[in-house]
Amino acid sequence: MANIKSAKKRAIQAEKNRRHNASRRSMMRTYLKRVNAAIETKDKEAANTAMKDVAPMLDRYATKGLISKNKAARHKSRLNAKIKAL
């Protein structure tokens, strides 16, 4: 454990941010699973609705640095391709 006050504070902040980011990553994965589940059941309407929720979320997390912008683009591209194939 750190001895310097500022290092202790940064350790606490890092842990707080880690928990927050883990929560956001979990939520993102859940929403991605919803889109994939709709695609699996071949429900285009539900897939489009779920995609409308996921796309801005991916962009937001890419902007905030939770995921890279390429990863966000890759997810959106692949999901849209799967939806169009229905």
UniProtKB/Swiss-Prot annotation:
The keyword Ribosomal protein applies. Disulfide bonds: none annotated. Gene3D superfamilies: Ribosomal protein S20. One of its GO terms (biological process) is translation. GO terms for cellular component: cytosol; small ribosomal subunit. The keyword Methyltransferase does not apply. GO terms for molecular function: small ribosomal subunit rRNA binding; structural constituent of ribosome. Residues 1-26 are annotated as: Disordered. Binds directly to 16S ribosomal RNA. This is Small ribosomal subunit protein bS20. It comes from Idiomarina loihiensis (strain ATCC BAA-735 / DSM 15497 / L2-TR). The gene is rpsT.
